[in-house]
């Protein structure tokens, strides 16, 4: 009689505790993410567990329609989203949060924004267009092991989070020690993204933005941002990251995780 053998995930663990988080997008997912990310960073820094910097990039201002679904309040209207978020959480937790008051839409701007001497970049794309993902992917492919890429996205009730690391070192069968190895990016998991034709946020019309805003659900945004936070919390822990992809459904409450096992990663 054969027995099923449970495959244990091999933790992905960074070699440094000096990290720069660059969040692209301060809307539905990004504004909720920074709420918990700043708390996590504050706890780790107070305990002497690492040095962390946070930068948020977004070219939008807060509108009344953002107040319900996104992490903003009525008095925030008319102000730059990045300024609202940076001021709120830097004052709350005594952190210095960098701001970029524009959309990052080309590779040179991305490299300039992520690079801070001595700090390893983690780029978090909280965007609702594939053109930005394709731009980030070009930099990701051209600069192996330069940064970790966390992407999150969602439809009305479904969402996903994906952690990618471009490395020639693949996880080997039978390997068990935590370390850094290749994790598939959102583009590798969903290669059809490369065939899409959409616009950068700065190129969209008012009609485009209105349709997109109405397609979102507040529960989905909160859950997606929470899953990103959970994965970052794992990543910064002593044990490392054991999940590289999560799919969720805000209507049913279902969450499905892909673990960092040889079987899951061998084909990427």
Label each residue range with its predicted role.
Residues 2-29, 33, 130-131, 135-268:
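Glycine-rich phosphate/adenylate-binding loop
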Residues 2-5, 12-15, 81-83, 89-90, ...:
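Localized chelating/binding microdomains
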Residues 17-47, 55-63:
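Glycine-rich adenosine-cofactor-binding loop
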Residues 50-95:
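Glycine-rich phosphate-binding loop and adjoining beta1-alpha1-beta2 segment
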Residues 77-120, 127-134:
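A structured beta-alpha segment of the ubiquitous adenosine-cofactor-binding alpha/beta core
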Residues 121-122, 147:
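Conserved acidic residues
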Residues 123-126, 151:
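Redox-cofactor binding/interface segments in oxidoreductases and associated redox assembly factors
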């Amino acid at each position: 009689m054969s027995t099923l053998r449970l495959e244990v995930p091999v933790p992905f663990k960074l070699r440094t505790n000096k990290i720069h988080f660059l969040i692209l997008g301060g809307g539905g997912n990004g504004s909720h993410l920074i709420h918990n990310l700043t708390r996590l960073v504050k706890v780790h820094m107070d305990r002497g567990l690492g040095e962390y910097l946070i930068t948020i990039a977004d070219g939008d201002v807060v509108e009344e329609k953002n107040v319900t679904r996104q992490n903003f309040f009525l008095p925030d209207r008319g102000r730059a989203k990045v300024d609202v978020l940076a001021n709120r959480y830097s004052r709350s937790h005594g952190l210095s949060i960098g701001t970029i008051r524009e959309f990052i839409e080309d590779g040179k701007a991305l490299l300039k924004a992520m690079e801070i001497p001595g700090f390893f970049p983690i780029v978090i794309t909280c965007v609702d267009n594939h053109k930005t993902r394709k731009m980030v992917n070009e930099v990701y492919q051209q600069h192996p092991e330069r940064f970790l890429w966390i992407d999150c996205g969602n439809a009305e009730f479904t969402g996903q989070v994906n952690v990618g690391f471009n490395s020639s070192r693949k996880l080997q069968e039978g390997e068990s020690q935590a370390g850094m190895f290749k994790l598939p990016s959102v583009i590798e998991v969903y290669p059809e993204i490369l065939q899409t034709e959409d616009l950068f946020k700065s190129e969209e019309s008012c009609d485009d933005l209105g349709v997109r805003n109405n397609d979102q659900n507040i529960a989905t945004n909160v859950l997606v941002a929470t899953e990103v936070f959970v994965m970052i919390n794992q990543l910064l822990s002593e044990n490392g990251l054991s999940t590289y992809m999560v799919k969720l459904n805000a209507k049913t409450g279902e969450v499905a995780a892909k673990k960092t096992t040889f079987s899951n990663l061998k084909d990427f």
